[in-house]
Amino acid sequence: CQYVATAPHYLESWGDVEIKKGHYSLMQPTIHPLFNTRQFQDTLLKWTGSDQSYYDYLRAMWETNVLGGKSWNKALHDGSFKVGAEDQEVTLNEVDLAAANAALSSAGDSEMEITVYVKTGLGDGQQANNPWLQELPDPITRTSWDNYLLISRIDAERLGIKNWTVDNGALNGNLVNVTANGVTMNNVPAYIQPGQAPGSVSIALGYGRTDLKKDMKVGVNAYPLAGSAYHEVSIEKAEGVHEFACVQLQHTIMGREGEILKETTLEDFVNKPVEEWNHAPVFSLDHQEVTQDKVDLWEPFDDTIGTKFNLSIDLATCTACAACIVACHAENNVPVVGKHEIRVSRDMHWLRVDRYYSSEMTVERGKEEGIFGSGDFFEAQTHPSDAPEVSFQPVMCQHCN
């Protein structure tokens, strides 16, 4: 016999967390539950014969054990509460290093190992029926509506696996059969990922669910491969071609770091004049290079009469988590277009976060090899490094400023 106990979304729920020892935070619902659901903790209370709601239980627990006479409403307003905690001495004496080394030694000498992970958007698959999350491009691969086997360029070339761009600009790739943990998964899309360690492959959990709406039944179920941190894996190329829904096919900045992606080191930021690490852009006007203020299409706007709101993003801390993209989608009622339209460059995200890899071919190297300015030079610049540095560039529509 099976029972279904529907629970609300976490944004419809009460809860608390201990961020670290002595630091507590409260979770409160942002909206009233949309459907006739009951929070899991309320269900537990009901099953134990209690008529108390989880909100009442949570508040009583905080007032008794956490707040120490302080105001519940203030803690709720502030979002966090700190209590005194004794320092704890941490030692490694209880870690059985010998057993860990023995486990590694017995892992085998397979050429390949597989790791499973969860994506930033879809997570473990509990929200796989949410089209916002399905359409959200992965911050690194920039691909949506899919999971896939990530493989390094070196291993892909050895196995004859390829990704290629077709005439309409969309990305295609080979399929592979994957065997690990005693399980074989057939026809898994293979995506060549810069920075993937040779000898390793990985695949995201949360996809391949069969109890969803038709358009949400995408990807392959990788849970049978999960069991431990390490699995030997065998991979063989399969017949057929997979069509990816990838929103970014230009993966390197191609020598335009100072024009499009402005970055510098902390040392240069502190010690060098701003003109050296933040060059002012120049434009051509009447056959002369002029600064931006000379070519503005609009008359200056007097913003002294009131507040002028602005948005600044600290690129040093942006990890492309994509929470802003989903928030923008929700706030502005942006439609979801589906995998096919994403594939043919018709995504409707108002906000995107481009991802750029570093390339081994730089201007300096091109000049040293005597190919700077040639077709070979520009072709080499399009190839990411096997162990690239990664930069993120948020690109917003005018509503954000």
Predicted region positions:
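A cross-kingdom feature strongest in bacterial/archaeal respiratory oxidoreductases
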Residues: 1-34, 62-351, 361-362
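Secondary-structure capping and boundary motifs in well-ordered enzyme cores
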Residues: 23, 317-320, 389, 396, ...
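Short Gly/Pro-enriched turn/cap motifs at secondary-structure boundaries
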Residues: 35, 139-140, 385-388, 397
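Primarily the internal scaffold of c-type cytochrome electron-transfer domains
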Residues: 325, 329-395
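Non-catalytic, well-ordered alpha-helical segments in soluble enzyme domains
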Residues: 38-63
